[in-house]
């Protein structure tokens, strides 16, 4: 009797999410999630660095045989894990190789969740320096949003429209401490009293 399948740690939606979930399940069966993740990263890196590879993968006019040949060459050259090669073959057969980049991003989400990594996004009007990011990391790591045994991965996004302050998003929670939201609340109160 085979072991029970490992359930993906988070539910993903959309076609790219479906493919990423299938890739995760297949690699979990082989106990090769980490190797699969490395293969996916290697291919993503190749696509982002080599414009010709990116162009070929996103060309819907390629014949099925040409797409399969591209998959075969990439698999051999990059020494991709068999589950990643199989995914590419399925994508080639369905003329969906252009989805690989978004599938890779979704697979990264699954891999992070599987490894206990919680992603936080901090939106600020200007880029934050490392001292502030370290304080935020420490503060968020010790909060109820991360939990024991989890690792925090923090990302700083810049949006000048928030004027100042921060918007912190951890998992599915969001705290808006931006100057723009305070101004909007003040405007709303003022317009209601007039």
UniProtKB/Swiss-Prot annotation:
Biological function: Mitochondrial membrane ATP synthase (F(1)F(0) ATP synthase or Complex V) produces ATP from ADP in the presence of a proton gradient across the membrane which is generated by electron transport complexes of the respiratory chain. F-type ATP synthases consist of two structural domains, F(1) - containing the extramembraneous catalytic core, and F(0) - containing the membrane proton channel, linked together by a central stalk and a peripheral stalk.
Main location: mitochondrion
Molecular function as annotated in GO: proton-transporting ATP synthase activity, rotational mechanism
Gene: ATP5
Entry-linked Gene3D superfamilies: N-terminal domain of the delta subunit of the F1F0-ATP synthase (1.10.520.20)
Protein name as annotated: ATP synthase subunit 5, mitochondrial
One Pfam family per UniProt: OSCP
Keywords: ATP synthesis, CF(0), Hydrogen ion transport, Ion transport, Membrane, Mitochondrion, Mitochondrion inner membrane, Transport
A single cellular component GO annotation: mitochondrial inner membrane
Species of provenance: Pichia angusta (Yeast)
Record has Cell cycle as a keyword: no
Compartment list: Mitochondrion inner membrane
Organism domain of life: Eukaryota
Assembly, per entry: F-type ATP synthases have 2 components, the catalytic core F(1) and the membrane-embedded component F(0), linked together by a central stalk and a peripheral stalk. The central stalk, also called rotor shaft, is often seen as part of F(1). The peripheral stalk is seen as part of F(0). F(0) contains the membrane channel next to the rotor. F-type ATP synthases form dimers but each monomer functions independently in ATP generation.
Family affiliation: Belongs to the ATPase delta chain family.
Topology in the lipid bilayer: Peripheral membrane protein
InterPro entries (alphabetical): ATP_synth_OSCP/delta_N_sf, ATPase_OSCP/dsu
Ion transport among keywords: yes
């Amino acid at each position: 009797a085979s072991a029970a399948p490992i359930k993906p740690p988070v539910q993903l939606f959309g076609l790219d999410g479906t493919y990423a979930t299938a890739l995760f399940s297949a690699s979990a069966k082989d106990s090769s999630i980490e190797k699969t993740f490395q293969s996916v990263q290697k291919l993503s890196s190749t696509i982002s660095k080599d414009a010709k590879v990116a162009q070929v993968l996103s060309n819907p006019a390629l014949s099925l045989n040409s797409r399969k040949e591209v998959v075969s060459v990439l698999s051999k050259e990059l020494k991709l894990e068999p589950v990643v090669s199989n995914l590419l073959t399925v994508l080639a057969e369905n003329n969906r190789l252009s989805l690989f980049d978004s599938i890779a991003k979704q697979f990264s989400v699954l891999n992070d969740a599987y490894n206990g990594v919680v992603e936080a996004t901090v939106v600020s009007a200007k880029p934050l320096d490392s001292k502030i990011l370290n304080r935020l990391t420490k503060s968020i790591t010790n909060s109820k949003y991360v939990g024991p045994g989890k690792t925090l991965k923090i990302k700083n996004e810049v949006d000048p429209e928030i004027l100042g302050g921060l918007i912190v998003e951890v998992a599915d929670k969001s705290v808006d401490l931006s100057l723009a939201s305070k101004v909007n609340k003040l405007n709303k109160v003022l317009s209601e009293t007039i």
